[in-house]
Amino acid sequence: METYHLEQAARRRIAGRLLPFVFLLYAIQYVDRVNVSFANLRMSADLGFSDRIFGLGAGIFFVGYVLFEIPGAIIVERWSARKWIARIMISWGIVTVVSGFVHTAHQFYTARFVLGVAEASFFPGMIVYLTHWFRLSDRAKAIAWLMAAVPSASVLGSLLAGWLLSIRWFGMAGWRWLFVVEGIPPVILGIVTLFYLTDRPAQARWLSEAERNWISQELEAETTVKKKIRSYTVWQALSSKRVLMLIVPSVLAQIGAQAVIFWIPTFIKRLSGLPASRVALLVALWGLLGIFGMLLNGWHSDRTGERRWHASVLSTANY
């Protein structure tokens, strides 16, 4: 009974401290990644960009992202999640602010590519970080909390964009302020991350000694079991049939998802003729249901211990 109470106390304390914070970080990251879709409601007209220029600029982000995604995740595992995530946030915040001052297509392409490099490995790094704190039986709920930041960011980002696009401070267009204003929070939160996050349970002064020992032993036991089954190098993992079977549907799903995310504000505006503020409100609506769905799916996956169908059915229904 004493062990049970210790376990429950440790799990609550870890979840209560880490999950709201990583949720906030990912929400801010996602807002900054897709804010260009709302900026485009005014930006392309102001700068004379064609749809081709905007589409290439939106997509070139992922070239930089893919190149540095895996190396960054390895750094999180082998060095320090706290320091690396802080570095990511500060650098992407600065690049986002600078994006508000582009004037040419080449400047736009460069800003998007560098933003991809700056943000690369944030999401996989977060997943790796959560494995340092949550047992396998708790991991789906933790990841669901993280993923719920995406629809939440859609709601927050849409409402904020609707307001920012309507302003014109100091003679500067609202879409420029959209980048500047939304680039400041990650810089601040990056600094906060250095002091707030803890890399490993053994370093957590905010846990009691008994709680630190319990979670460390639980995670170490899981690691030992996995190593006995098989230990993979990075290249072995990337060439694994199971990994490839996950990569292919994920890539296909993201092709559709990112196309919708980057173009839906423009499509709605062209089809409806509504002002930017109304367009932003319509885009925000789907996020409200997404928050509920992700948290419910993660909770039910942990409750039943089933992963495959919870991932595949929801993904198929979504896309």
Regions found by a protein language model. Name each.
Residues 36-37, 235-297:
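Extracytoplasmic gate region of multi-pass secondary transporters
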Residues 77-89, 302-315:
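Cytoplasmic membrane-interface "Motif A"-like loop-to-helix N-cap segments
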Residues 48, 80, 101-107, 118, ...:
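Helix-breaking motifs and short loop linkers at transmembrane-helix boundaries and internal kinks
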Residues 111-149:
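Cytoplasmic helix-loop-helix junction between adjacent transmembrane helices
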Residues 59-74, 284-297:
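Central cavity-lining transmembrane alpha-helices of secondary-active solute carriers
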Residues 67-106:
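Conserved MFS/SLC helix-loop-helix module at the cytosolic interface between two early adjacent transmembrane helices
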Residues 17-51, 157, 260-265:
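Extracytoplasmic
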Residues 140-165, 169, 185-186:
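Glycine-rich segments within core transmembrane alpha-helices of 12-TM secondary carriers
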